[in-house]
Amino acid sequence: SDSKIGDGCFGLPLDHIGSVSGLGCNRPVQNRPKK
């Protein structure tokens, strides 16, 4: 699930970078995957 979050925002797998995903960039993507 986290891996898809980073994909929609930075285009990179933030699956191991939970801190970066907490910026709120993955929050909207979490509900609706851009991919």
From Swiss-Prot:
Domain of life assignment: Eukaryota
Output a single Gene Ontology CC term carried by this record. extracellular region
- State any GO BP term from the record: vasodilation
Q: Could you confirm whether the keyword Disulfide bond appears in this record?
A: yes
Q: Which GO terms describe its molecular function?
A: hormone activity; toxin activity
Q: Which UniProt keywords apply?
A: Disulfide bond, Hypotensive agent, Secreted, Toxin, Vasoactive, Vasodilator
InterPro entries given for it? Natr_peptide, Natr_peptide_CS
Q: In which tissues is it expressed?
A: Expressed by the venom gland.
Please verify whether the record's keywords include Disulfide bond. Answer: yes
The record's subcellular locations are: Secreted
- Give each disulfide bond as a residue pair: C9-C25
Q: What does this protein do?
A: Snake venom natriuretic peptide that exhibits vasoactive and probable hypotensive activity. Is only weakly active on natriuretic peptide receptor-C (NPR3).
Q: What else is known?
A: Negative results: does not activate natriuretic peptide receptor-A (NPR1).
What family does the database annotate? Belongs to the natriuretic peptide family.
Q: What is the name of this protein?
A: Natriuretic peptide TNP-a
